[in-house]
Amino acid sequence: MNIFISGISGTGMGPLALFAHDAGHQVFGSDLHEGPITKELKAKNLTFAIGPQTGNYLAEIHQKTPIDWYVHTSAITESHPEYQRAKSLGLKISKRDELIETLVEKHHLKMVAVAGTHGKTTTTSMLIWLSQKLGLKASYMVGSTLNFAPSAKYDQGDQFLLYEADEYDRNFLAFHPWLSLITFVSYDHSDIFATAAEYQEAFLKFESQSEHLIFGPHANLHHAELLADKHPDVLLMSAKELMLPGEARRLDATLAIKAVQRILESLGREVNHEEIIEAINQFPGVGRRFERLADGLYSDYAHHPEEIRATINVALEEAKRTQKKGVVILYQPHQNIRQHEFFDEYRDIFHGIKKLYWLPTYLSREDPKLKILTPSDFLSSLDNPEIGTADKLDDTLFAKLRQDLADNYLVILMSAGDADPWLRQKFL
């Protein structure tokens, strides 16, 4: 099958491109800018173009190698030139979920899906790490770069697909997993789900499509009660003591451990609990999830109040362990529309930190009628506004951060926008 993937270098589409390539399909693609997966795509010698997505490149590829399937992100609407060109060429068109489900069926894989508002990437990465350490034959796709493996892999003969299942745009409803892990459920993505009830209903439907379920301790456990008759093997679990920083990361680890135990049992293999614990305690982490960039300097993808709270707990633990003076946070909110929803939730989540540098919101898919909230709007609403200043990505901020590091603070960026590449360019 010949596949053309739009948005190929991002963390959503890039792993799919790598997986399909490994599975023997010819993969081409395009992207407006180079993304986090670009290096991995080049290492596999995939053919793709970076720049304006006019549709001309798609047509050129199609003329040489007839494309069977055009796959696009949510950012590519029906009016987009490349989408229009795919339509005019008579190509099959879909988002990634339909292609992934087709590949799962074609290659006879049992999907182990990780879903939830937070913790998906870390939990999936832990599953990948454990599967490699324990010699499990498992393919995978994860929405991040990994520092111990590619972001996706398929090997012929693999029995399982470890997959980070995204609820955005209801993508995960295309799947019927053998096993689903539900990390945490808290209302998000109001541009897709009009109400919290609608968001919950999507998760409930996803759970009903799963053969087996494992819930994290904070994943709205009433779902398990609702599904108990249909799924008598629903597993409710609690955290165990692990040698990993941060309660949230330890909870993610317990889910990954329980999933690996279930996989091993299904294969008739012995479950060596000590071996599993030893392996998970060696987990090296994930790109953009409390990622260490330099001594005392970290970057994290957190941009939801619950994620921020969890990441602060990790940072405070790490600062204490490494004898830092305290924690300094550089925060860039993501999407103005979401900030209107989260505004009141920020009030008390920054307790325990020493300094907070608040950046303007990274704008994406916005409602033009909504007022753009400023850093000052947020800071004035905090319980502890004295810790914060309104800042921007400039040399003044760089000087502040450099001084904080020199003064032995732990500095962490929390952002899903353009602050991460800025930080790397300045410090690395």
Positions of predicted regions on the chain:
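ATP-dependent carboxylate-amine ligase
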Residues: 1-48, 65-70, 88-91, 204, ...
